[in-house]
Amino acid sequence: MLKPLGDRVVIELVQAEEKTASGIVLPDTAKEKPQEGKVIAVGTGRVLENGERVALEVAAGDRIIFSKYAGTEVKYEGTDYLILRESDILAVIG
């Protein structure tokens, strides 16, 4: 299990559409980079200058939208994940 540090979050990516609305199959090179994912794990929070730790606003299980080029892609046990900072998360879905 991946356990992020500090204000980082581990995201499982929601895969891009394989076909367009009109039924055209898209090759991998034409697919949009995903911006939606499911939070798998969260870090312990960020530390303020006074040493106080602030908990993250997202939790495991949340579906989120994040910045297009945010984070670092990693592959762990055959699954693709993205590790990013909480500040790169734009919204929680639902």
From Swiss-Prot:
Intracellular or extracellular location(s): Cytoplasm
Keyword Thylakoid set for record: no
Pfam family, one: Cpn10
GO function terms (MF aspect): ATP binding; metal ion binding; protein folding chaperone; protein-folding chaperone binding; unfolded protein binding
Keywords associated with the record: Chaperone, Cytoplasm
GO BP annotation list: chaperone cofactor-dependent protein refolding
One CC-aspect GO term: cytoplasm
InterPro entries in UniProt: Chaperonin_GroES, Chaperonin_GroES_sf, Chaprnonin_Cpn10_CS, GroES-like_sf
Bilayer-crossing regions: none
The family this protein is said to belong to: Belongs to the GroES chaperonin family.
Biological role stated in the UniProt entry: Together with the chaperonin GroEL, plays an essential role in assisting protein folding. The GroEL-GroES system forms a nano-cage that allows encapsulation of the non-native substrate proteins and provides a physical environment optimized to promote and accelerate protein folding. GroES binds to the apical surface of the GroEL ring, thereby capping the opening of the GroEL channel.
Subunit structure, as described in the record: Heptamer of 7 subunits arranged in a ring. Interacts with the chaperonin GroEL.
HAMAP family the record matches: CH10
PANTHER family membership: 10 KDA HEAT SHOCK PROTEIN, CO-CHAPERONIN GROES
Name this polypeptide is given: Co-chaperonin GroES
The organism of origin for this protein: Bacillus cytotoxicus (strain DSM 22905 / CIP 110041 / 391-98 / NVH 391-98)
Native organism taxonomy: Bacteria, Bacillati, Bacillota, Bacilli, Bacillales
